[in-house]
Swiss-Prot record:
L-aspartate binds at residues 183, 229, 457, 504. Belongs to the class-II aminoacyl-tRNA synthetase family. Type 1 subfamily. It comes from Leptospira interrogans serogroup Icterohaemorrhagiae serovar Lai (strain 56601). It is an enzyme of class 6 (ligase). Catalyzes the attachment of L-aspartate to tRNA(Asp) in a two-step reaction: L-aspartate is first activated by ATP to form Asp-AMP and then transferred to the acceptor end of tRNA(Asp). GO terms for biological process: aspartyl-tRNA aminoacylation. GO terms for cellular component: cytoplasm. The keyword Aminoacyl-tRNA synthetase applies. ATP binds at residues 229-231, 238, 497, 549-552. Its main location: cytoplasm. SUPFAM superfamilies: Class II aaRS and biotin synthetases, GAD domain-like, Nucleic acid-binding proteins. This is Aspartate--tRNA ligase. It is found in: Cytoplasm.
Length: 601
């Protein structure tokens, strides 16, 4: 390697930072040849590094015999170049390039490495299948989209650390090898060689450890942490993902929400130049479910669910009247301009809602020139139809869809339909951001399949002040479990939950009662959470916290379609890494050391 190259590694210039003020200066650059054009005696090379692209010009009369080296350059060759920065002629200015008014005229060129022809175009405007990009992830990094998202990810996390450091938070790493407590998703298990037939679990969250840190007096903790869940994957799920995990001592829910609002406002402004207005709006869990059919409502558009049970309870349409009589509900969602929806589309919606949400049917009415029209409107009095139209604010050209069933089925099915139809009829404005707190969650939810109470968030969530009397005895708790609310809160952005948390239980007595109502007996509680329960007896302060999904936030803020778009080396929806080809078999010797024998599948 020529001496001028090694001497200039630390003195290099960055392509994207060059400008006209450096005209006449000698420039040293390192990077990859993105494009090249041979025009006979003059070769133009678009040299790309992490910061951008600059045009370098190789002229035969200046390079002499070295010009033959420039003729060998091909796509993605690794180059070292030295030359003089000059302004381009007016006719050769490229307004689409950040450095389109300048170029570097070469006096030295070295090919540091050659490259095979890439299996796909690295031009950001060319479409490439996700499978191919995941297999050759190292090439995808050279494309503008992924590279820029990785840089934004770095800036985002750096801004978080900087802000929290100023707010007296301490970053502490919690264990990756942990105890299995399979309360939610499946754990990833790691066999212990030194302790045969014993297993570690990769953490689904640092929940217990951060509470232990509060007992230990650390008071303000945060961590950018990897978490692991062995679950079926969707667009916004990965087996390993990154959270901003936080915990505070001696705080109320109000103080936590205020602290988080300051953090979010600051990092959105610093990294994405997005100006947010704080405090964020708040909505109760009950309102979210009743009006939007979701605990993470997208509030960028209307189409609320409207309860018309009182209007239709005495109508002649038995599907509606019967649902109300049996303790259910009837709701309607009005779709602006939806009268163009075809019967075939309605049949498809009906089948989908039946399959995925157990909805028994999907009644509908169109708002025509004479009011509401449908095959079922003859079963309603004129006043009833007018009252339905008034309740949901329908006008000519709109379509009304009805759900009539148990309240939970109606809310979930119409909530899902609302989201699907918004894509066509009430598409949110591009770059619009709506952030809302969802508060006053139920503490428990009834599991119909297992006939038991489950924690809506997790077993360590504190009851609200209004619900504390329910915990005076197990008898009162059994009677009122369905009415107990929690000091829990979720932060929702554009219909996606980006963070959530709660005030924690710091009383051993209340924690024991929560375990009991969840069907966790004393022995099981001690086995799974014994060290936390013991810690609560050594002066646990009032504390609470939350966790943000870093990947989800970045997906939304960078316009990604999936969190795979903002993770450096993501897995597919089958949990595979196409680049490294993992998971993979291991040698028999390794299994023997772990005392593991494989079962045939």
């Amino acid at each position: 390697m020529k001496h001028w190259i090694q001497e200039n590694y630390k003195n290099r210039s960055w392509a994207g930072e060059l400008n006209e003020s450096q005209e006449g200066k000698q420039i040293v650059l390192f990077g990859w040849s993105f494009r090249f054009r041979d025009q006979g005696g003059v070769i133009f090379i678009d040299l790309r590094d992490r910061t951008g692209i600059i045009q370098v010009v190789a002229r035969k009369e200046l390079l002499g015999d070295s010009f033959t080296l420039a003729e060998k350059v091909r796509s993605e060759y690794v180059l070292a170049v030295r030359g003089t920065l000059k302004k381009r002629d007016l006719e050769s200015i490229n307004p689409r390039m950040q450095t389109g008014t300048i170029e570097v005229v070469l006096d030295q060129l070295e090919i540091l490495n050659v490259a095979k022809t890439p299996p796909f175009s690295l031009d950001e405007f060319d479409e490439v299948s996700e499978e191919l990009k995941l297999k050759y992830r190292y090439l995808d990094f050279r494309r503008e989209e992924l590279k820029n998202r990785m840089i934004k990810r770095h800036e985002f996390i750096f801004a978080i650390r900087n802000y929290l450091n100023k707010r007296k938070f301490v970053e502490i790493e919690t264990p990756i090898l942990n105890k299995s407590t399979p309360e939610g998703a499946r754990d990833f298990l790691v066999p212990s060689r030194l302790n045969p037939n014993q297993f570690y679990a990769l953490p689904q969250s640092p929940q217990i450890f951060k509470q232990i840190l509060m007992v230990g007096g650390m008071e303000r903790y945060f961590q950018i942490v990897k978490c692991f869940r062995d679950e079926d994957l969707r667009a916004d799920r990965q087996p390993e993902f990154t959270q901003l995990d936080m915990e505070f001592s001696f705080v109320s829910q109000e103080e936590i929400l205020s602290e988080i609002e300051g953090l979010v406002e600051t990092i959105y402004k610093e990294v994405f130049n997005i100006q947010l207005s704080i405090p964020f709006p708040r909505m109760t869990y009950n309102t979210a479910m009743e009006e939007y059919g979701s605990d993470k409502p997208d509030l960028r558009f209307g189409m609320k669910l409207v309860d018309v049970s009182e209007i239709v309870k005495d109508c002649d349409f038995n599907v509606f009247a019967g649902a109300v009589k049996n303790g259910g509900t009837v709701k309607v969602v009005c779709v602006p301009g939806g009268s163009i929806i075809s019967r075939k589309e309605i049949e498809d919606y009906t089948a989908w809602l039946n399959r995925d949400y157990k909805a028994k049917g999907l009644a509908y009415m169109k708002h025509g020139t004479e009011g509401l029209e449908s095959t079922i409107t003859k079963r309603f009095k004129k006043e009833e139809l007018e009252a339905i139209s008034k309740a949901c604010g329908s006008k000519e050209g709109d379509m009304l869809f009805f759900g009539a069933d148990e309240r939970e089925i109606v809310n979930h099915s119409l909530g899902a339909l609302r989201l699907k139809l918004s894509e066509r009829f009430e598409t949110p404005k591009e770059n619009e951001i709506n952030i809302t707190w969802i508060v006053d969650f139920p503490m428990f939810e009834w599991n119909k399949d297992h006939k038991r109470w489950d924690a809506l968030h997790h077993p360590f969530t504190s009851p609200s002040d209004e619900s504390i009397p329910f915990f005076e005895s197990m008898e009162t708790l059994q009677k009122n479990a369905g009415n107990a609310t929690a000091k829990a809160y979720d932060l929702v952005m554009n219909g996606v939950e980006i963070g959530g948390g709660s005030i924690r239980i710091h009383s051993r007595e209340i924690q024991n009662k929560v375990f009991q109502i969840l069907g966790i007996n004393e022995e099981e509680a001690k086995e799974k959470f014994g060290f936390l329960l013991e810690a609560l007896e050594f002066g646990a302060p009032p504390h609470g916290g939350l966790a943000f999904g870093i990947d989800r936030m970045l997906m939304l803020l960078t316009g990604g379609k999936s969190i795979r778009d903002v993770i450096a080396f993501p897995k597919t929806q089958k949990g595979l890494c196409l680049m490294s080809e993992c998971p993979s078999p291991v040698e028999e010797k390794q299994l023997q050391e772990l005392k593991i024998k494989l079962a045939k599948v």
